[in-house]
Amino acid sequence: MGGERRRLSNWPMLHLKQSLKYGLCALLAFANGLAARAQYQTLLSHDLATLQVLRNGDWRQRLPLISLTGGDEIQISFDDFSAAYRRFTYDVVHCEADWTPSTQLFATDYAEGFAEGLTIDDVQPSRQTQVAYTHYAFALPNDQCRLTKSGNYEVRIYDERHELMARACFMVTEATMKARLTCTTNTDVDVNATHQQIAWAVDYQGVNVTQPDREIKTVVLQNGRWDDARINVRPQMQTPNGLAWQHCRALIFDAGNVYRKFECLAVDHPTMGIAEITWDGRCYHARLHTDEPRPNYVYDESAQGLFCVRNSDNRDNAILSDYVMVHFSLQTPLTSRPIYLNGHFTGDRFSPTCQLHYNETAGLYEAHLLLKQGYYSYQYLTPGSDGRMVPVASEGNFYQTKNFYHALVYYRGVGERTDRLVAVAMP
């Protein structure tokens, strides 16, 4: 492998006419547009991989979210395939509810110390791996940068030439308001079938909100996916003390199915979900069992899109875990619409590297990604008629699926200069 990341092919979709390609691009615009605006977790260089943004290093946390007054921290890490040490720096940028930078704030308005040009100094080379890399990590807040305002934050990571290499996003909340959320399978479109519906409410907790349409912004997320976020849905009820959403069709989600999963802990024998592991003289290849159609719901524990880096010894996972070329295959009827792998390890983006391509000889959709050893949960999505990404039909869509929902409440009072994150709700 020689320390270089193997790039994936961008094959043309079989039997897809040029005009249809343009149409599919339009269908994807909504999903990718919101993801791009959210600027969630994004790698901008093929030299970098495995960007993680975790609260207290806990991969089970659904959202990278900390309290303004708590003692938690956001831990950010990534790997660099160039292997040799590079001086990476980062800036911390406060953002509005829509993830655009807060142009009315100076850095001193949201951070004590420094918010620009900070050096990443926790650097470790990989050990005993076939694919060489250097691991970089840092945490916020730290001795140089202490955050003083709630809201959305984007960390911009630069190389020594000050070229933007990655964006890492997280949220800081304050307990100014209170929100509550419930999920039901008795929806306005079906009952105990293929959908789940969210009902929720916001209590102002004494905050004087005079123009809620202007002062309050809301986001509802399923499994932490910003590409499918429901933004500023109009509430059915407004009172002097709060807002409520009941029987709101915009808050109906596809139930989907339990995310598929695999675990690559060792390179000398297959582990969960892996059919075989081979060596090509440069790197290891892990071929997963073919993902077959799921006509029925079968309960299984899954992290619903999360992933965790680890190896069989569960020791020094960050620098002892190797990179493996993972081969995915999906048995599903040929379709004119593209099919994508989706999970937090893809950044919830639908890029060419995450697209599956049809292998006529095998009669399967296939994709391969270079991934760090560990546990991964994933699903297969395709553009729906409205442009939103929906589960591939053969994956199944069942009301029993255990999905994770969050509602975020942002507030900007009259005369204030930015959006604050004042409440977070989950079932």
Language-model region placement:
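Bacterial Sec-dependent N-terminal signal peptides
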Residues: M1-Y40
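Short, compositionally biased P/S/T/A/G/V-rich stretches that sit at domain boundaries
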Residues: Q39-L68, T176-V189, S302-R315
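Low-complexity, Pro/Ser/Thr- and charge-rich linker/hinge segments at domain boundaries
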Residues: T42-L43, V172-H195, F398-V422
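Contiguous beta-strand segments within globular domains
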Residues: L51-E96, V191-V202, D316-F328
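Short acidic/polar inter-strand loop motif in beta-rich domains
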Residues: W99, C145, D159-M165, V267-M272, ...
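Aromatic-rich carbohydrate-binding modules that target alpha-glucans
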Residues: A111-Y136, W226-V233, H327-Q373, S385-V414
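Ligand-binding face of N-terminal immunoglobulin V-set domains in extracellular IgSF glycoproteins
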Residues: A132-D143, S150, I157
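Basic K/R-rich, polyanion-interacting modules in nucleoproteins and related proteins
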Residues: A286-T335, P427
